[in-house]
Amino acid sequence: MTWRESGIRIFTSQKARRVYNLARTRLWQSNSFGTTPNPNNFVVLRNINTSYAGFGQASYEILPKLTLTGGVRVTYDERTTRLITPPRNAAGVVTFPATAATYVRLADTQPSWEGSLRYEVNPDVNVFARVSHGFRGPTIQGRNAVFSSAFVTATSETITSYEAGFKSNLFGNTLRFNATGFYYKVKNIQLNGNDSNNNGLLFNANQAQAWGGEAELTWRPIRDLTLGLGGSVLHTEVNDTRVYTPVCKLNGVVTCTVLNPTINVGTATLAQINGNALPNAPKYQFDGNARYDLPLGNGGKLFLAGDVTLQGYTSFVPYKTIEYTSDGTFEAGLKAGYSGPDNAYELAVYVRNVTNEKNLKGVLDNYNAAVFNDPRIIGVSLSGKF
């Protein structure tokens, strides 16, 4: 039996920060709306994060070539946020809600653990299985104060995951092939949305689950040529019949095509998200790369390399829409250059996004704003190791 690691860790951080409502400040100061410039449009927050943990891990070879590894950790996690300077209007009158708390404290103690089995089929192939449980501590979002809104919070989420797969290094180390299948469930999952005033908010849903697989292959068919291929498939879904999230709405008008059932609560329009995919979780992703090196007499080498990525259906918000998704996005890159002896330095020319694709990478749904990838970039790079 091998005792791998144990100990106690303590972490604490304290930060006072000033948060500005930059968009409104610029508008007010430029008189875009005919309003008086407001130099008081900021807040000061003091955030204190404290964490204590005790942990241990051990491994035991229960049979020849079969190793069991287990570990446990207990963590205390505390967050506090205090409003030091509230927002004010141009006349100096406080605009933070009088009934809202100016100090919020959240704390939780949770165990984390894992257990795994690894079997060495031969020196080049091993198979494994693993189960683990962890958590993400509570969260306080104090920045809403700059918009004259109360703090928003989310309690701890826990995750239990299962995975199994194999790793291999074959044919004289010329072929490496690894594959894994997995399933995980997140209880009390923390999600992001926006309220009816377009302010960001945090909330908890009952649970979410996901399953899928991933694989990677690296092959060197000849000495100076390396080919790589990787891929993953993923299914995710939120499981909570009672959770709703605000949708894209600006000046009282829903501005995107919402595909989920909706209800109106006050000025907000809410969509039911039960069964929806998690945001930013592509259904599939494939990556390929290739590199050819031409050795030179001085120990350096010339090289030519390329890569490509293909990403499947992805939703960028918790609710289903037509506009806030991407599907089948594609991007490729090329690079050629010279690498010095022992890879001490490299001089190269490169092209990113060779075909100048315009791919949606994210959205700010409360402002109807899109985030796209970079356009085609052509450049020269020089790098070195010291």
Question: Residue locations for each model-derived region?
Answer:
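Transmembrane beta-barrel architecture of outer-membrane proteins
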Residues: N49-F55, Q110-W113, N126, I159-G165, ...
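Gram-negative outer-membrane beta-barrel transporters
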Residues: L68, Y183-K185, F203-P318
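Transmembrane beta-strands of outer-membrane beta-barrel pores
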Residues: R9-S13, V74-T80, V131-G137, N144, ...
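Structural signature of Gram-negative outer-membrane beta-barrels, strongest in the C-terminal barrel
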Residues: T2-S13, L45-Y184
